Amino acid sequence: MMLWKFPVRYDVIVIGGGHAGCEAALASARMGLRTLLLTMNLDTIAKMSCNPAVGGIAKGHIVREIDALGGEMGKVIDVTGIQYRMLNATKGPAVWAPRAQADKLAYQSEMKHRMERVSNLDIKQGTIEDLLIENDHICGVITKEGISYDCQAIVLSSGTFLRGLLHIGETNYSGGRAGDQPSVGMSASLEKYGLKLGRLKTGTPPRINKRSIDFSCTEEQPGDPGVKFSYDNEGIPRLPQVSCYITYTTEETKQIILSNIHRSPMYSGKIKGVGPRYCPSIEDKVVRFSDKERHQIFLEPEGLQTQEVYVNGVSSSLPFDVQLAFIKSIPALRHAEIMRPAYAIEYDYVISGQIDFSLECKKIGGLFLAGQINGTSGYEEAAGQGLMAGINAANKVMGKAPLILKRSEAYIGVMIDDLVTKGLDEPYRMFTSRAEHRLLLRQDNADLRLRRYGYEVGLVDQTRYDRVKEKQRIMEEESERLAKTFKQVSNKGYTLTQLLCRPENTYASLLKEYPDVMQNFGEEINFQIELNLKYAGYIDRQTSEVAKLAHVEKIQIPIGFDFSTVNGLRNEAKQKLNQIAPRHLGQALRISGVSPADISILMIALTRYQEPIEKERLTSDCSEA
């Protein structure tokens, strides 16, 4: 094939225009690097291929962290959402999670519009056929259209497109998702350069016509007021808000599915990829939970300008006639019209152990991976990885150290640490239970935790950084003042802190009761002061646990350290440690197959390894003196 060389040499090329690719491209360009986003179709940038929603349990935390670091997802959903809710609001604050129903076409359009306005960012349509690599380092790409682009780093965020195969009953065909072609050349290129690929599976439910739903048989679910994702979107106008609706499957639904289970490619053996355990298809639900009488379904509008409704809870790969039959077995959907059928999709991903904590490939320098190619599922998980990959690709080009978030700092840090240190046997989904220090990683304090990093890499401007520093100052000073200010209650003196910590009291109620001594800093700051004081004991305990682990995290492991030379380490530990190459002892401790006894042996070995290096350094210093 004759190639035409594009005359501009880019610093960073981002492959794929999904949620990971958007964040990666924006981060790299805003950090001052000449960036190119290459995607197969400019009309599908930021497309919501599955559910029309952003956020949810743990996922909402990630979106707020993306925003705190200077990313875009939270800002876009705040202006394109058609319903907002705070999930788990009746539980403890560690698991409260914002979720928004999106107008998915508005979301796509808004994200694309924002990207097109960013200087340093070029957006072009093209399908990647091959990577250009010299001396084990990325140097460019070749497209199907016969164009070669040179660069210094690449972020690959291919979603479900790598050798994608769609399944609807006995029918299957190649595709990246419904209506889009797959990427075949990229998979072959990755294998050619030594990366090991596996297969995963995900699925999506049918979309039905809103006019065909009997809403009298459903339970209305309105949104919650005051929920937002971005720390910078105060007072912005919002789209008209709508409700979602709840309904349930029936015994008839169950029998229809069970009598046709042999026609499901999941159960006939046609699908080889592993699906997400925590987002099962309706086939899996009726088989695995056979004692359950019914399963909950959420009817979610896909936008203000469409009649399509997403039937959340019935992801399926059954044939269309079976889909139609089980949908019509639900009372609210007796007359339902399916506008788009459900389907399952298999796709390639890079098997665990081949990227480091910066998301850079170990075998190919300058190649960063983000999103479903790393084995994750979900828009939010992809966007979080995309942001970090974009930051670290830019840092590599500029000769700077990568930004690596700790598990105690962010859910994004937990996710990436898990992806690197733990093997995946199914699509990875973030849960609050994966984080050891959930009370420190609340959705409300992401700006206090992470905005500094966004400022340091150049994604957060001085004004926004000053705002969070001022917020921190107010919270600290007010907490001290509340602990020193007394009020008489039933002839007994109590500090305002003591009164606030009573279960029946809130910051808002004390503002009304004691307006002479309570100060109003706005709902957000008032709320955080209240949480920090009410949960002070638990927060202090988790902070202490983090401090205890810090000394293990500080014991660095030299780059290129050969674990096979350490006497006493079990063979499994040697293999896993050499494969993953942890940067410090804390990461080594979390690797599956590495025991506490292995860590003790490794700690001694590292001490001995460092002794001659330290002695040589001291000798050198003395000679120079």
Curated annotation (Swiss-Prot):
One Gene Ontology biological process: tRNA wobble uridine modification
Keywords, sorted A to Z: Cytoplasm, FAD, Flavoprotein, NAD, tRNA processing
Similarity comment text for this entry: Belongs to the MnmG family.
Subcellular location, principal: cytoplasm
PANTHER family in the record: GLUCOSE INHIBITED DIVISION PROTEIN A (PTHR11806), PROTEIN MTO1 HOMOLOG, MITOCHONDRIAL (PTHR11806:SF0)
Known cofactor(s): FAD
HAMAP family tied to this protein: MnmG_GidA (MF_00129)
Oligomeric form and interacting partners: Homodimer. Heterotetramer of two MnmE and two MnmG subunits.
Coiled coil: none
Name the record gives this protein: tRNA uridine 5-carboxymethylaminomethyl modification enzyme MnmG
GO MF annotations in UniProt: flavin adenine dinucleotide binding
Localization per record: Cytoplasm
Source species of the chain: Protochlamydia amoebophila (strain UWE25)
Signal peptide location: none
Binding positions (FAD): 16-21, 128, 183, 372
The protein's role, per its UniProt record: NAD-binding protein involved in the addition of a carboxymethylaminomethyl (cmnm) group at the wobble position (U34) of certain tRNAs, forming tRNA-cmnm(5)s(2)U34.
A GO term from the CC aspect: cytosol
Gene3D superfamilies in the cross-refs: FAD/NAD(P)-binding domain, GidA associated domain, C-terminal subdomain, tRNA uridine 5-carboxymethylaminomethyl modification enzyme MnmG/GidA
NCBIfam families assigned: mnmG_gidA
SMART domains from the UniProt entry: GIDA_assoc_3 (SM01228)
Lineage, top ranks: Bacteria, Pseudomonadati, Chlamydiota, Chlamydiia, Parachlamydiales
Binding site residues for NAD(+): 275-289
PROSITE patterns hit by this protein: GIDA_1, GIDA_2
Alphabetical list of InterPro entries matching this protein: FAD/NAD-bd_sf, GIDA_C_N, MnmG, MnmG-rel, MnmG-rel_CS, MnmG_C, MnmG_C_subdom, MnmG_C_subdom_sf
